[in-house]
Design a protein with these regions (language model features):
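Short acidic (Asp/Glu) and glycine-rich catalytic loops that position anionic groups and cofactors
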Residues: 95, 190, 218-223, 253-257, ...
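Switch/connector loops and helix/strand junctions flanking conserved nucleotide-binding motifs
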Residues: 232-234, 249-252, 299-302, 329-332, ...
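Conserved S-adenosyl-L-methionine
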Residues: 130-244, 249-251, 258-260, 267, ...
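Conserved Class I SAM-dependent methyltransferase catalytic core
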Residues: 14-16, 202-207, 267-340
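Short beta-alpha connecting loops at secondary-structure transitions
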Residues: 195, 234, 256-262, 322-323, ...
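A generic structural signal for well-ordered coil/turn residues at beta-strand boundaries
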Residues: 238, 242, 333-334, 349-352, ...
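Short, surface-exposed amphipathic charged segments that create phosphate/polyanion-binding patches used
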Residues: 238-240, 333-339, 369-375
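Non-catalytic, mostly N-terminal accessory regions of nucleic-acid modification and defense proteins
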Residues: 1-152, 222-233, 322-325, 350-359, ...
Length: 473
C-alpha cells in the first residue's frame, strides 16, 4: 500500500486496484477461471518476468474482460474498469504479495479479509474520496448485529449496502456460533453462504467493493447494483431482518421516489428508506430491524409524522439509541439507531419506546478518543435487561424482556409511553437528559468543532429548504 501511495494512488483508487487483482487470484483459488480468457489468468501474471509486458497485458485485460466473459459476477467486478497504476513494477509488487499468501489456509484468507476491511475504513477517512458516507463504524455495526441476534435459516438484507459491512458482520456472528458452518448439511451451508444475506447498492464503486468484500469473507451473496427507492425495490420483501445505515441527505433536486407502493412518498431519503425497511419485513411478530437514522427523521412534520405513526402502528418500535456526535465521517451529523420488530397486525404494535441517551455529556470521539465497543457497555446492559457486555453473544438471544428492562437503574435509560409520544405530535426527538444532570461532563467539546458542527447543520437545513421550495414549485 505504501508503494502505491508513493505512486500518487489514493486509498479509493488502491481499493479498486486491489479488487481487480484479488478477484483474479480468487478465480484461481475458487476454480472458476474458465470464465477468464487464458492469457489473462492468474498464473500468466505471476510467471511473467517482464514487468512491462505483464502490466500491458493487465491493462488489456481490464479493457476487454467485461465483453469477453460469460460470467455475470466477473462483468460486475470489472464494469468500466481501468488502472490507476503508473509504474509496471507496482503491479508486479501487488501480484507477488497476493500470491505469497496461502489462500488455501483459512487464517490467511481471514487476514486478507481483515486487510481489505481496514483499507475500506482508511478510504472512508480520506475526505477527498467522499467514501465516508458508505462507512459505518465497526463497533456500531457489531453491536447492532449482536442485539439483533441473527439465526440460521433467516434471510437478512441491507437496502443501502455500502461495502456490505452489516451483512459481513452478521455472517461472522453466525460463523463464530456455528463452527464456520462446518456442521451444517450441504443444503443449509449453501443457503447461509448464498441466500442468507443480500443487499442493494446504488453507487458503482461501492457496489464493486461490496462484491469483493463479500467474496473475501467467503460469502456468495446477491448484491444488486440499483436503487432501492425505485420500482426494483418493491420486490425486496419477506425478510427476517434488516440492518442498514441509509445515506444522509435529501434526494437529489428534491425528487420523490419512483415507488408507487409507498403510502407517504417524500423527498426525504431516510424517511423513504425507513418506509421501505418496515414494509420489507415478514409480518410474523419476529422479523426485526436496526437502522441508523439522523435526528430529522425523529421530528420532521407532515409526512414525517405520518411515517413515524405508521411505523409505530405496524411495528413495535421498542428502542431508540441516541448516538454521540463525531462517530461518522460526515462531520456534525446527529444520528440514532431505531430498533423495531414487525407485528402480525397493522395497528397499535408500539406500547411505548425505551430511549438511551449516549449523546449528552460524553467525550468528543475522534483521534484522541477513539470510538470503541466499550462505549456501548451501559447501553448493552440496559437494552438486554442486565446481560453483561462480555457475554452478549452467548447469553442474549434477541428477546426483549420488558420486566428486566424496568429494573435497570441508569439515568440515561427512560421509557416513554405511546400516549405521551402522541401528545407530542408523534415526535421521537425525546430521551435526551438535561446537560447538567450528569456529573462527568468535563469534556464538552472544542468550540471550533462545535462551530463546524453548527455550520454543517445549517448547510443540511438549507438543502432541505431548497428541496421544499422546489417541491412547492
Amino acid at each position: 500500500c505504501n508503494v502505491l501511495r508513493d505512486d500518487g494512488v489514493t486509498y479509493h483508487q488502491y481499493l479498486n486496484e486491489l479488487t481487480y487483482i484479488l478477484f483474479l487470484k480468487l478465480s484461481e483459488v475458487k476454480g472458476f477461471e474458465e470464465h477468464i480468457p487464458e492469457q489473462y489468468r492468474w498464473r500468466s501474471f505471476v510467471e511473467e518476468t517482464d514487468n512491462t509486458e505483464s502490466f500491458q497485458r493487465y491493462r488489456s485485460f481490464l479493457a476487454e474482460v467485461s465483453n469477453e466473459t460469460t460470467s455475470a459476477g466477473i462483468k460486475e467486478i470489472y464494469a468500466n474498469a481501468s488502472t490507476s497504476l503508473r509504474k509496471p513494477v507496482n503491479f508486479n509488487t501487488l501480484v507477488q504479495a497476493i500470491d505469497d499468501l496461502d489462500w488455501y489456509e483459512e487464517t490467511d484468507r481471514d487476514v486478507m479479509g481483515d486487510i481489505y476491511e481496514s483499507l475500506l475504513e482508511k478510504n472512508a477517512g480520506e475526505k477527498k474520496s467522499g467514501a465516508g458516507q458508505y462507512f459505518t463504524p465497526r463497533p456500531l455495526i457489531n453491536i447492532m448485529v449482536e442485539l439483533m441476534s441473527p439465526k440460521l435459516g433467516e434471510r437478512w438484507n441491507d437496502p443501502a449496502a455500502g461495502t456490505f459491512g452489516f451483512m459481513i458482520s452478521a455472517d461472522e456472528y453466525l460463523r463464530t456460533k456455528y463452527d464456520n458452518y462446518f456442521d451444517l448439511s450441504e443444503k443449509d451451508r449453501k443457503f447461509q453462504i448464498e441466500k442468507a444475506f443480500s443487499g442493494v447498492e446504488l453507487v458503482g464503486d461501492a457496489h464493486r467493493l461490496a462484491l469483493m468484500n463479500a467474496r473475501l469473507h467467503g460469502m456468495e451473496s446477491e448484491i444488486i447494483l440499483g436503487d432501492t427507492l425505485t420500482e426494483m425495490g418493491k420486490g425486496l420483501n419477506g425478510f427476517d431482518g434488516v440492518l442498514a445505515n441509509p445515506p444522509f441527505g435529501t434526494k437529489k433536486g428534491g425528487e420523490r421516489p419512483t415507488r408507487d407502493d409507498f403510502t407517504y412518498p417524500t423527498s426525504n431519503k431516510q424517511l423513504n428508506f425507513l418506509q421501505h425497511i418496515y414494509r420489507s419485513l415478514k409480518k410474523d411478530g419476529k422479523a426485526r430491524a436496526a437502522v441508523v437514522l439522523p435526528d430529522n427523521v425523529l421530528f420532521e412534520d407532515g409526512d414525517g409524522q405520518k411515517i413515524r405513526r405508521d411505523l409505530m402502528d405496524k411495528c413495535n418500535l421498542h428502542t431508540i439509541l441516541r448516538l454521540p456526535t463525531g462517530i461518522f465521517y460526515a462531520a456534525g451529523v446527529k444520528t440514532n439507531v431505531l430498533f423495531f420488530t414487525r407485528g402480525t397486525t397493522e395497528t397499535e404494535n408500539t406500547p411505548g419506546v425505551w430511549f438511551y441517551d449516549m449523546r449528552t455529556n460524553v467525550p468528543n470521539y475522534g483521534k484522541r478518543t477513539p470510538f470503541t465497543r466499550t462505549a456501548f457497555n451501559d447501553f448493552i446492559e440496559a437494552y438486554t435487561g442486565g446481560v453483561k457486555p462480555d457475554s452478549l453473544t452467548t447469553a442474549f438471544d434477541g428477546t426483549i424482556n420488558e420486566n428486566a428492562r424496568k429494573k435497570v437503574d441508569n439515568e440515561r435509560w427512560q421509557y416513554i409511553t405511546r400516549a405521551t409520544i402522541a401528545k407530542k405530535n408523534d415526535s421521537l426527538d425525546l430521551g435526551l437528559i438535561a446537560d447538567d444532570s450528569i456529573s462527568n461532563g468535563d469534556d464538552l467539546g472544542d468550540p471550533i468543532e462545535i462551530a463546524k458542527e453548527a455550520l454543517s447543520e445549517l448547510e443540511s437545513i438549507t438543502l432541505q429548504l431548497q428541496a421544499m421550495i422546489k417541491e412547492l414549485g
